[in-house]
Amino acid sequence: LGADALDPGAIDRVFEAKGRPRDRPLSLGVPDVDAALEYVAPTDREERFMRAFLPGPVTVVLGRRDPVPDALTAGRDRVGIRVPAHEVALAFYREADRPVTATSANRSGEGSARRVEAVSRSIREAAVVLDGGETPGTESTVVDPSLDDPVLREGSEADAIRAWLRG
């Protein structure tokens, strides 16, 4: 579910459409790692990690830069970055020429919609639906490389991520 990730009003509408609690941050979607660097300040190791796993099914939590609003991060000083390995999403991000909220097109607490037909009415009423075909339905692995236990949510490639971070 995408909206302008720098516009607090647009971000609020995403929270409303999803019924998502405002204390649960949204991720910021961009077309590539270089675009992400405008919005986050990774360490050298964190940037190497990004380049190793993005694009891919990973959300990397990093220190945010000033343009990223509190509304997106629930006031936290870190933001999740998504560069999906999905050509329709990447084309949308490139065309938007701005960071976009990166969250699943479902109501909070419901399973991810893998096909456009599974997108709930409340989401359809709040947004334009782009049909990029069926998605794998596997959640991204959420990683904060700065933590001792960096995997915050296990998803695709979790074992490879842990191995890279240990190495």
Describe the function of each predicted region.
Residues L1-G167:
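Active-site-adjacent structural elements in enzyme catalytic cores
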